[in-house]
Regions:
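A structural supersecondary motif
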Residues: 235-238, 247-256
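Positively charged, low-complexity/disordered segments
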Residues: 1-14
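Terminal end segments
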Residues: 263-266
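Short, solvent-exposed mixed-charge patches
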Residues: 358-359
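Primarily short, surface-exposed interaction patches in extracytoplasmic proteins
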Residues: 12-223, 251-260, 273, 279-341
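Globin-like tetrapyrrole-binding proteins
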Residues: 345
Length: 359
């Protein structure tokens, strides 16, 4: 049961102590059946990776075991750590890693598509002081990153390299669930940028909580303002994934996920069309546009700029105005017909591939 919000939050953490505790080999894992004492050490199976654990300095207040392990992992003789990190950075920026099995760099892993590039990025990463900001800046400023998903010789290149292993164009991909939710909050002007604090509980339909014996205590929605925070602060439970996030391939927290599934299923379209969260974002954006822009055409023009960060082309603006007038006629008997019609336009725009996909 979730504690009251006024209760201080505590977290468990490991602490290092100077006095080393003897570690025994346990027979059949039974703590009451201790065998000989096992000394700490590195991987003895591989000779060049096996190093003794040194004793700490006399004035040290810790055993230095965890520090030596950290130094061992990040040592320049260890070729894996830096490569694993830059491969994950590349995967998040480009949509696909140089090694497509980010959790497995062993003998059964996929071979790197560009081994020289992986080695070079890893060396630049280490020489740059293991700075993720530097390596991210380097990648996003490259010609490879700035490519379009379309190519003037698209048909010819597709026949030669249909999987784009040679990176002759950008891999178009849909936004992750968290990025999509945050983007919707951003364009509607609803995003709460508060940092830190406890996680928030979003509102859920009663049907989602049917499996709980105590529905009221199992899930208490946070205040509306807190529910507009970034998705990184959203509560994540193993036994209950938020339906909207799950529809867009939000992974389960029951096991590590190095590479998310990217599905295209009907539940995603239904969520974007019918979910109350989506309709609220459309309505709030329309409300802001009406307040800031008096003319209908100006409001629709700025809706395009707000959602796509570009001005609409003449035929796009014409189609949007046509849809707006059609919806306004449909809602003519309602007092807020203009708001409803403009909300419909915004709803159509955020359902477009241009908004949902990173090109």
């Amino acid at each position: 049961r979730r504690p009251p919000r006024s209760t201080p939050l505590y977290s468990s953490a490991a602490s290092d102590v100077y006095k080393r505790q003897p570690i025994h080999l346990l027979i059949n894992g039974d703590p009451d059946k201790k065998s000989f004492i096992v000394q700490p050490g590195h991987l003895s199976l591989v000779k060049h990776l096996n190093r003794p654990i040194e004793d700490p300095p006399k004035d040290s207040k810790t055993s230095w075991r965890r520090r030596q392990l950290a130094e061992y992992i990040t040592h320049t003789d260890n070729p894996l750590t830096s490569r694993v990190i830059v491969n994950r950075i590349w995967q998040h920026l480009m949509g696909k890693g140089i090694v497509t099995t980010p959790n497995n760099f062993g003998f059964k892993s996929a071979s790197p598509t560009h081994p020289e590039l992986l080695d070079w990025l890893a060396s630049e990463f280490v020489e740059g002081g293991w700075s993720m900001k530097k390596i991210i800046k380097m990648i996003v400023m490259s010609e490879t990153y700035k490519q379009s998903s379309t190519h003037p010789n698209n048909m010819e290149c597709t026949q030669i390299d249909p999987d784009n292993r040679l990176l002759w164009k950008r891999n178009i991909r849909r936004m992750d669930a968290e990025v999509l939710r945050d983007s919707l909050l951003q364009v509607s002007g609803d995003l709460n940028l508060k940092k830190g604090g406890e996680s928030f509980y979003p509102s859920l339909a009663p049907e989602v909580l049917e499996g709980f014996s105590r529905k009221s205590s199992a899930w208490t929605p946070s205040p509306d303002k807190d529910q507009l925070r970034r998705s990184i602060y959203m509560i994540s439970k193993r036994h209950l994934l938020i339906p909207f996030m799950k529809a867009f391939d939000f992974p389960s927290s029951e096991k590590p996920c190095g590479n998310r599934n990217r599905t295209t299923v009907v539940s995603q379209s239904l969520a974007m069309l019918n979910n109350q969260f989506i309709h609220s974002r459309s309505s709030n954006l329309a409300r802001v546009l009406i307040q800031e822009h008096g003319e209908d055409e100006d409001a629709i023009f700025n809706a395009w700029k707000q959602i796509f960060s570009r001005e609409p082309k003449p035929h796009e603006l014409e189609a949007s105005l046509k849809h707006y007038h059609k919806q306004q006629s449909y809602f003519s008997e309602k007092d807020n017909s203009r708001l409803l019609a403009l909300s419909s336009v915004c709803h159509v725009l955020i359902n477009s591939n241009e908004f949902l996909y990173i090109d």
